[in-house]
């Protein structure tokens, strides 16, 4: 701790960021690391034994192909085979018509690249077209580097082997021999979330960050998609399991902010918490065995009063609704998503995106051809790899690619100087490479925001030390050339994406916030009563809110990187947006508390008041796009009937009013926190 105190604050924040990113714990990560690590060592062994070139490309196939579960790995393997056919076909098309004409090669490769980049952004299978784009723009440089067409054709045919045998290898390892099934990961994830929920129910613990809660909720939704595709039993009882996922997400996210010490520890409340924890444990055991949980618990009047006193009635009701649900309930038919985005042919940003990528590649090609420096051909690959839809995400990818390349180059330099002279055989080489590949696999399986560092580090290391050599190598020029190529490609891409049709998310962010608040207003319009349809709708929209808040948070981080914006305007936009996100989360949890109280009343007394909140929130959201939103001021009229039956409801809704009043005023020249008390609200 004393060492951290002596470091500058930015360094401490950077270390904390990497600690959070790299220490991510999720089901399936350890098997994925092992599969990736073993696969890399097998690729080195096979490539060195049979003298197969392009080792770095084979390693890249593994890092992109081995996924967190067997079904996803199999799906990506199929995409890789399709992409390989399209890649080789496009290369032979270029060679056939323009082998000896560099200008004609570019004229043919350019439209192929543009079409692939356009489809990468607009089509569901964008990964296939991304791979084709990389090979098309890179493969057309082979004739310029080699004077013999036969050699070029041989290298192109080797590319088929280099791409397909790692695909076969990852299918054997990740799908057939040591599969990590999505259904097993789902059972583990649900049990982990319920463990956390029980801990917060019984002990006074600090709440976990909301971003972590939202990411865990999104992870459960992704696993649900894989389970539907991979497991027949899950599909048969999908309605129950989807309801289970929604219920567990709600319990986990709600109890995260629960503090048992905030309520009087009467004997009735203590016994009720123990009973609730016991029911959650029963759900855990059923999930661990892959069984649909059925409960015979019927809440008594005393238990209902205890649940209401400690704000647990809604959690109790959602849990019981799951326990009494028929496992054979037919699922709701899911709408099939379109293969292309709706505005694929009407939004000019997609074609501009393709043109910008092509322009960056042409500038890099002209530069390295003009200076006759073929070793920096990685600059063209960099232009394609860092091409993201907007300026902020492109900058993020540039930083990750540069950071991974820097780490890989340093490792390659140390390896060449200190280790390579002492190696005599393939066994020693594998022992030395094992920790490097393990480190790369560990980083590559971390959070999506930083995982690319691991992939780039291993690929850069392999390019500098293992590419097309089948024995000791002491040439440091390769290390220099690969690093310089990545730097040049990053600089060119940064200039192009910043000044040529920059796609800023500064205007999109308020619209995204408006959509999120619109979802929150829909939650407020759902009748606050224990009716099965209302509860299920409430839970599903609530999961959507987790995804929406997380998307807004990530968009804020990307907008912070858009240096082409005015610094003061950017800072003001980010501060206001983060305040809206923070208050929106608080409003959602405060509205949960009103459900616990409103359920005791006749619902006919409540719609007007709930509609008042929803209308105010929708009005505020409508003004975000034009920066005309003011902090809502809501007047609550005390209803004698509700005050007589349950006086705590009015206090809870007054708290919601206070949270509304703290929403930022977007018409002010600078963000000033709302200190005035909402009309009708009490402290």
Spans of features found by a protein language model:
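C-terminal functional regions that serve as terminal interaction/effector modules
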Residues: 418-419, 423-427, 434-438, 446-474, ...
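Long, hydrophobic alpha-helical segments that serve as membrane-spanning/inserting helices
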Residues: 1-34, 41, 49, 70, ...
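Juxtamembrane or sensor-core-proximal signal-transducing alpha helices
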Residues: 170-182, 495-506
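Alpha-helical transmembrane segments of multi-pass membrane proteins
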Residues: 61-62, 354-366, 376-387, 402-414, ...
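Membrane-entry segments of alpha-helical transmembrane domains in multi-pass membrane proteins
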Residues: 26-31, 46-52, 74-82, 97-104, ...
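A cross-kingdom feature marking solvent-exposed beta-strand/loop segments within repeated
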Residues: 42, 74-78, 96-101, 147-150, ...
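Pore- and pathway-forming membrane helices of multi-pass small-molecule/ion transporters and channels
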Residues: 9-18, 33-74, 84-89, 106-173, ...
């Amino acid at each position: 701790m004393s060492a951290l105190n002596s470091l500058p604050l930015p360094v401490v924040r950077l270390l904390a960021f990497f600690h959070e990113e790299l220490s991510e714990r999720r089901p399936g990560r350890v098997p994925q690391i092992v599969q990736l690590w073993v696969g890399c060592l097998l690729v080195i062994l096979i490539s060195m034994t049979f003298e197969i070139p392009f080792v770095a490309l084979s390693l890249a196939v593994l890092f992109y192909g081995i996924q967190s579960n067997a079904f996803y790995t199999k799906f990506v393997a199929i995409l890789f085979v399709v992409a390989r056919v399209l890649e080789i076909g496009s290369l032979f098309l270029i060679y056939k018509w323009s082998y000896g004409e560099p200008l004609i090669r570019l004229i043919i490769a350019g439209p192929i690249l543009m079409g692939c980049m356009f489809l990468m952004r607009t089509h569901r299978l964008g990964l296939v077209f991304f791979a084709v784009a990389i090979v098309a723009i890179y493969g057309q440089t082979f004739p310029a580097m080699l004077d013999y067409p036969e050699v070029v054709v041989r290298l192109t045919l080797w590319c088929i082997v280099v791409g397909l045998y790692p695909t076969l290898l990852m299918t054997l390892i990740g799908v057939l021999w040591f599969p990590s099934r999505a259904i097993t990961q789902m059972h583990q994830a649900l049990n982990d979330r319920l463990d956390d929920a029980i801990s917060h129910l019984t002990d006074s613990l600090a709440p976990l960050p909301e971003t972590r809660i939202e990411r865990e909720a999104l992870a459960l939704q992704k696993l649900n998609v894989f389970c539907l595709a991979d497991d027949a039993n899950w599909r048969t009882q999908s309605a129950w399991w989807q309801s289970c996922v929604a219920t567990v997400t709600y319990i986990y996210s709600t109890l995260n902010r629960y503090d048992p010490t905030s309520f009087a520890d009467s004997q009735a409340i203590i016994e009720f918490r123990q009973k609730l924890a016991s029911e959650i444990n029963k759900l855990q055991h059923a999930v661990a065995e892959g069984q649909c949980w059925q409960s015979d618990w019927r809440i008594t009047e005393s238990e209902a009063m205890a649940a209401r006193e400690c704000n647990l009635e809604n959690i109790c009701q959602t849990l019981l609704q799951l326990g009494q649900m028929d496992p054979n309930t037919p699922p709701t038919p899911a709408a099939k998503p379109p293969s292309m985005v709706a505005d694929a042919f009407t939004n000019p940003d997609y074609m501009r995106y393709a043109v910008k990528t092509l322009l960056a590649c042409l500038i890099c090609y002209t530069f390295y051809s003009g200076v006759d420096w073929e070793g920096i051909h990685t600059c063209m690959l960099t232009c394609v790899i860092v091409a993201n839809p907007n300026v902020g995400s492109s900058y993020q990818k540039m930083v990750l690619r540069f950071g991974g390349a820097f780490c890989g180059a340093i490792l390659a330099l140390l390896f060449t100087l200190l280790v390579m002279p002492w190696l005599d055989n393939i066994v020693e080489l594998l022992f030395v490479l094992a920790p490097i590949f393990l480190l790369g696999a560990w980083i590559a399986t971390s959070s999506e925001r930083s995982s690319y560092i691991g992939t780039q580090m291993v690929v850069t290391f392999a390019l500098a030390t293992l590419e097309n050599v089948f024995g000791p190598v002491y040439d440091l020029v390769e290390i220099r050339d690969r690093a310089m190529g990545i730097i040049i490609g990053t600089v060119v891409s940064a200039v192009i994406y910043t000044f040529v049709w920059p796609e800023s998310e500064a205007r999109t962010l308020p619209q995204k916030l408006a959509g999120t608040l619109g979802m929150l207003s829909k939650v407020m319009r759902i009748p606050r009563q224990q009716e099965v349809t209302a509860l299920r709708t409430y839970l599903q929209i609530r999961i959507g809110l987790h995804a929406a808040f997380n998307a807004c948070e990530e968009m804020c981080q990307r907008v912070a990187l858009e240096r082409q914006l005015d610094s003061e305007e950017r800072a003001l936009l980010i501060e206001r947006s983060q305040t809206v996100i923070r208050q929106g989360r608080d409003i959602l949890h405060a509205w949960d508390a009103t459900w616990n109280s409103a359920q005791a009343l006749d619902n006919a007394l409540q719609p007007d008041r709930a509609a008042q909140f929803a209308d105010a929130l929708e009005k505020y959201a409508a003004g975000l796009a034009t920066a005309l939103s003011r902090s809502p001021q809501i007047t609550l009229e005390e209803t004698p009937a509700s005050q007589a039956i349950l006086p705590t409801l009015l206090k809870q809704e007054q708290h919601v009013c206070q949270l509304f009043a703290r929403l930022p005023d977007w018409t002010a020249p600078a963000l000033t926190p709302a200190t005035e008390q909402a009309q009708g609200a009490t402290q």
